[in-house]
Amino acid sequence: MGIQRVKFFRLIISYDGTDYSGWQRQKNAQNTIVGTLESTFERAFGRACVIIGASRTDAGVHAQGQLARVQVDFDISAHELDRAWAHLLPPDIVIRDIQPVSNEWHPIRDAQQKTYQYTIYTVRPDPFVARYGWYWNRALDVSKLC
């Protein structure tokens, strides 16, 4: 019997969170980003994985470049992970990069920066971008936002 080998990978993830209940698994929410990633992994490989994200986004929030770490307990390459997720994930979640990392690397501690962007439309937005901002149909006092 061989020794079980634990491997860690850094993920860079982009997602449209419109149809999700946020990043983190929740008892009363069926559709979360991490839940979708973990269940897709299990469907592809028949085994569970552990995923930790650098941030927990709320329901409906999007991310470009969310850092996460996946822990697996079998020998697999970043390329194999990428192919499986690219094939099975819904189109609103994309793994942009997968790299092996040591068990010392942690997404919460080692993320170098976080940028939050809020988009407010003061005119009715185009339907192709409307879900990525908030429409405010009154005068906007920018000084109160800073």
Predicted regions and their residues:
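Structured-RNA-binding interfaces characteristic of tRNA pseudouridine synthases
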Residues: 2-146
